[in-house]
Amino acid sequence: MNRKIFGIITFGTFASVAVLCAAPVRAADAKTPYPSMAPLDQYLIADRNAEIALARTAAPLSISRDATVMVLGPHGYETAVAGKNDFVCMVERAWMNPFDSPEFWNPKNRSPICLNPPAARTVLPLTVMRTKLVLAGKSKEEVKESVKAAIEKKELPELEAGAMSYMMSKDAYLTDKGGHNMAHLMFYMPLGTVWGANVVDSSNEVSEPFPGSPLLLAPSYKGNPEPIDMFLMGTGVWSDGTAAPM
């Protein structure tokens, strides 16, 4: 695979700095646009029904209409709709990015996702824990160390075979870069799995050890601290069946 699949979320060109003496400050801001957590209300969606609807756009209706739906509250995720098919749909926030991502605290991030049953059982608990710690006011380093400790103590479930998720929402805002979005599937595998995937770093830059491969190895998890490799594959179609950029 080349950069075409991931090109929609690469950096755009920034305007030149008008005042020369301000350049160092602006450069620093560009590298760390979100240095700390924004006020909580910027991450919440006031209309609960709107968040439920957005969560369901992550997967085709045949999956999402019978899924459990979770929404973000002031203290963490809570179940808004009880499902029938053991899938779970929700809208993730930016703190599910790698800990060194410059967008870790981006309040604009809205990432609808539907997890299949194995992922709901063994990947979702990571999301729930990270979120609870963030909303309790923990720093990035404190969140990371708490998750690491929970893994070492086996307080979190081990990854189950067959875990995957859908991120096919046309209305997602995944990143500030490019088109902000990408319709894709995600496959969760044990750390160190080799699938011949090209590699995405925490700034969404792509290196290509396997040109032509349709797979990307995401920067999330990767032992930092979760012992999971997450592979992405573009779908070329949104959850509503319309064509998506590739």
What residue spans do the PLM features occupy?
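Bacterial N-terminal signal peptides that target proteins for export
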Residues: M1-T13
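Sec-dependent, cleavable N-terminal signal peptides
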Residues: S16-V17
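Sec/Tat signal peptide C-region and signal peptidase I cleavage site
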Residues: C21-A27
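Primary mode marks residue(s) on the alpha4-beta5-alpha5 output face of response regulator receiver
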Residues: D29-M246
